[in-house]
Amino acid sequence: KSSKEDLAYEFKIPFTIFKNKIKMIQTSSIIANIDTQTITKNNKYINSIINIPIIMIDNKDISKNINDEITNSIMKFFNDSQKQAKEYNDALSEVENKFVANVDFDVKKNSDNILSILIKYYKYAGGAHGYYENVAYNIDIRNGNFLTIDNLFKEGSDYKNIINEEIRNQIEELIKLDEQNKGVYEFKSIEDKQKFYIQDDNIVVYFDLYDIAPYAAGIPEFIINVNKIDHILKPEYKEIFK
């Protein structure tokens, strides 16, 4: 993670900042107001558009901690990409396409004291196609805690096997819909810190490119409805799916 001093240095890079409209969902529970800070960079090495969520709640300390965590990760991607772009350009006598590095985000849930936000990274460094990765942050905005999937479930519960079975069932359905999906997915089990986001009454489990399927399959997502897991959720997290 970057220190405050490092972060201040990072922002000395020339860029243009725009303010986009605030994304806000009305609800009776605590919500976050979310603004967007946009960094653009276009030179002989790189084309880059970086959209950073700026999260605002009444508790300024919690807001700062959340923003530091997310912003530092995004800025590391941006700075690393600029270095890679220069190396990429210098290594080739002729560059057909510029290096591309973009970041955007989707707010998946902003209600019931939970903010679930998906940061979408994209990088192109030549070749047949670019590479993209999604990083979800699931935050209890009452206390600023970043939730991992195991945080949601009662200790000792068999949440992994329940989710694994549901994913296998969904893969079987994909194969029934299209025989070409047979043999595409090589799924064994979710991980201890499995990637996921929260949306409506669902936990959406997802996998990186190549994790369980080839590039052409994209980022596989599997929707786990609360009805499948309600009996093993911790009491304090049952309310987020109401």
Model regions: which residues?
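Compositionally biased intrinsically disordered regions enriched in Thr/Gly
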Residues: 1-242
